[in-house]
Amino acid sequence: MSTPHWFDQGSLVLASNNKGKVAEFEKLFEQLKLPVEIIPQGRLNIPDAIEDGLSFIENAIIKARHASKISGKPAMADDSGICVPVLGGAPGIYSARYAGEHGDDAANNAKLLNDLLPFRKNGEVIEGMFVCVLALVTHAEDPLPQIFQGIWHGEILEAPRGENGFGYDPLFWLPELQVSSAELSKEEKNKISHRGQAMQLFRESLV
């Protein structure tokens, strides 16, 4: 594995204040065994960026540039969410604030279930997918952010299952495994999830 020049700084800021995401990323970076310190932006008192992009890619870049500008360090940001085709792709980029208040997982899950009620009259399977876009910038004005994308396909349950994970994990059903995402361990989830897929592409970019 080669070491990109930004490794020379010895640290990489993770542009997120979401505790669930931070925990997953710390585990993923631990598994990658990269010779660089990962610093969650909260440790540097960096506030959340204003996510006013219209796509996962735009918001990931916005967050990465924001963290890099304040910290003066390379930064990686994740923008992710769940997309449901019968809802036109919603919640999409608004996943974290689907019910109005940012980060209210219970309310977001309840709204998604309610919005899907009209589509369940005949017992139809509701397909959904988790999307993760990672953006890596070496500095705040980096003209060529690196982008890594992962997509995880599944179905949306009629009621929550499982106690692990965060966000919409309790509603995300994996038919091939017969479990919800919230019934997977961190290690199991990281091997197959949208975030795990994107991180694997990041790892491969270093080779």
Curated annotation (Swiss-Prot):
Binding positions for substrate per the UniProt entry: 16-21, 80, 166-169, 189, 194-195
Binding site for Mg(2+): 79
One protein family per Pfam: Ham1p_like
Root EC class: hydrolase
Protein EC: 3.6.1.66
Keyword Translocase: no
Cofactor(s) of this protein: Mg(2+)
Residue intervals passing through the bilayer: none
Catalytic activity of the protein: XTP + H2O = XMP + diphosphate + H(+); dITP + H2O = dIMP + diphosphate + H(+); ITP + H2O = IMP + diphosphate + H(+)
Gene Ontology terms for molecular function: dITP diphosphatase activity; ITP diphosphatase activity; metal ion binding; nucleotide binding; ribonucleoside triphosphate phosphatase activity; XTP diphosphatase activity
GO cellular component, one term: cytosol
CDD domains membership: HAM1
PANTHER family xref list: INOSINE TRIPHOSPHATE PYROPHOSPHATASE, INOSINE TRIPHOSPHATE PYROPHOSPHATASE/HAM1 PROTEIN
Assigned protein family: Belongs to the HAM1 NTPase family.
HAMAP family assigned: Non_canon_purine_NTPase (MF_01405)
Name the UniProt record assigns to this protein: dITP/XTP pyrophosphatase
